[in-house]
Amino acid sequence: MNTEIIVLFIIHFIMINENVFIALLHYPAMDKDGKIIVTSFTTMDLHDIARPARAYEINKYYIVQPIDAQRIVIQRQINYWLSEEGRKANPTRYEIVQLVRLAYTLDEVIEDIEKERGRRPLLVGTDARTYPNTVKYSWLRNEIQKRDRDWLIVFGTGHGIPPDLMNTFDYILEPIYGAGDWNHLSVRNAVAIILDRLFSRNRCD
């Protein structure tokens, strides 16, 4: 058994929150006028979301990007960091990128999770607005800790996830409230904050 296979084996079986997955949607997304668009991938989307995903021991992190030219860029980066050269250059990045998967659509993500886990995950949307099915962090944390269901937490890009898609989710997580009214955070900020609120060992309840 080679070293890479051993590392993958260890990471898979020590993940505390193996029933939790996250997805970053580059499509569908909205522009400032509410028009449906495809947003562009940035390198920070890969590294700065994979890091908290690993720190809070999430099962997998999916990047949803349907544009082939963008997918080539993403896959090239993934392949490099999973190569022997990438592992030697940055072992930590080699480890976190093992959590990353690339998908064309959100449906593909759901199907992949179903194939691995044998059941459909409950979908949790994230937004700066509230919806009739908005839930609190404490509620979601308690439900996740029961370990009897799988959860897919979906993060938007651009100006957010379109309402038509949000309305199909099982739950919507309450917005991130800071010290005041300003909450225009990057998606990378939002992912880190939300995962910390749900899974940190030293969170303030």
Curated annotation (Swiss-Prot):
Membrane-related topology note: Single-pass membrane protein
Matches recorded under InterPro entries: Alpha/beta_knot_MTases (IPR029028), RNA_MeTrfase_C_dom (IPR019230), tRNA_m1G_MTases_N (IPR029026)
Membrane-crossing segments per the record: 5-27
Location of this chain's protein in the cell: Membrane
Pfam families documented for this protein: Methyltrn_RNA_4
Major location category of this protein: membrane
GO CC annotation terms, alphabetical: membrane
Keywords tagged on the record: Membrane, Transmembrane, Transmembrane helix
Assigned protein family: To T.maritima TM1570.
Name of this protein: Uncharacterized protein aq_054
